[in-house]
């Protein structure tokens, strides 16, 4: 995962945590941050095709015209299981929508491929690594 992130211009340290980060609350407790600083990487089916939605951990997705992808389709689209899906570095590029509320933080924490792996990154660096992402209310 570290190499995949580096190819997107992110110089971050992937950390393995002893506790699961499967939920935003678990991740926030393990990382010592606010729940809102956790980036939920969610796969939605929009017009039948997978799309990545990056949502703040303290928010719900309410403005996406689509539905959450089943676990098997999320894994097929990203190469990762739900609970460990990173915001980028997937097996294939996906259209990405980023929750604009993430900008209220300087740094956020993201899953890094497994339920126990995370990395922290400046929000603006994450957005720079996703140049084609649409940033808006989700």
Predicted regions and their residues:
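Extended, low-hydrophobicity, polar/charged segments
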Residues: 1-138
């Amino acid at each position: 995962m570290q190499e995949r992130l580096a190819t997107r211009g992110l110089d971050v340290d992937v950390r393995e945590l002893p506790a699961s980060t499967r939920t935003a609350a678990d991740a926030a407790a393990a990382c010592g941050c606010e729940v809102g600083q956790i980036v939920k990487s969610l796969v939605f089916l929009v017009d039948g095709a997978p799309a990545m939605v990056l949502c703040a951990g303290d928010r719900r997705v309410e403005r996406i015209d689509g539905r959450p992808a089943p676990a098997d389709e999320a894994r097929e689209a990203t190469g990762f299981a739900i609970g460990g899906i990173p915001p980028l570095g997937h097996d294939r590029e996906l259209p990405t929508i980023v929750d604009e509320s993430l900008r209220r933080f300087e740094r956020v924490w993201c899953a890094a491929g497994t339920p126990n792996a995370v990395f922290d990154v400046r929000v603006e660096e994450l957005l720079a690594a996703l140049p084609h992402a649409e940033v808006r209310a989700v």
